[in-house]
């Protein structure tokens, strides 16, 4: 990944966090890493559900959400399980996808493949 792509991704995640805060989420962690993978954003909703949020962004005309393939999804699930065992074993949680297209945001909640 080049510098331009890195900066675009970071900017998109920054904007995603602001969008989530406006919806009432509290951002707990960003870019959580484990040996299994990474989770872009971990946030707590007003109803106290833990949200693991994968951010996909595009400035082009293609559908960013299709970049979440089965292999990436499985890595995220393993990372969630690791996080839950270590930090929040009894809390309700879900996996969400936040699509950023230019200035538009679409939060797709509780995704599965």
Swiss-Prot record:
User: What domain of life is recorded for the organism?
Assistant: Bacteria
Pfam families the record matches: UPF0102
- Select a single GO molecular function from the record's annotations and give it: nucleic acid binding
SUPFAM superfamilies xrefs? Restriction endonuclease-like (SSF52980)
InterPro entries per the record? Restrct_endonuc-II-like, tRNA_endonuc-like_dom_sf, UPF0102_YraN-like
> Gene3D superfamilies from the xrefs?
3.40.1350.10
* Entries under NCBIfam families matching the protein: PRK12497.2-4
Tell me which family the UniProt entry assigns to this protein: Belongs to the UPF0102 family.
What protein name applies here? UPF0102 protein Ccon26_01140
- Species per Swiss-Prot/TrEMBL record: Campylobacter concisus (strain 13826)
Taxonomic lineage from the root:
Bacteria, Pseudomonadati, Campylobacterota, Epsilonproteobacteria, Campylobacterales
């Amino acid at each position: 990944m080049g510098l331009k792509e890195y900066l675009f991704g970071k900017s998109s995640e920054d904007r995603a966090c602001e969008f989530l805060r406006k919806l009432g989420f509290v951002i707990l962690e960003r870019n959580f890493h484990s040996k299994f993978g990474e989770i872009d954003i971990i946030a707590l909703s007003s109803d106290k559900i833990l949200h693991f949020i994968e951010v996909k962004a595009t400035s082009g005309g293609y559908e960013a959400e299709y970049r979440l393939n089965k292999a990436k999804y499985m890595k995220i699930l393993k990372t969630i399980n690791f996080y839950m065992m270590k930090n929040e074993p009894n809390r309700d949680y879900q996996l969400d996808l936040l699509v950023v297209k230019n200035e538009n945001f679409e939060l797709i909640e509780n995704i599965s493949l």
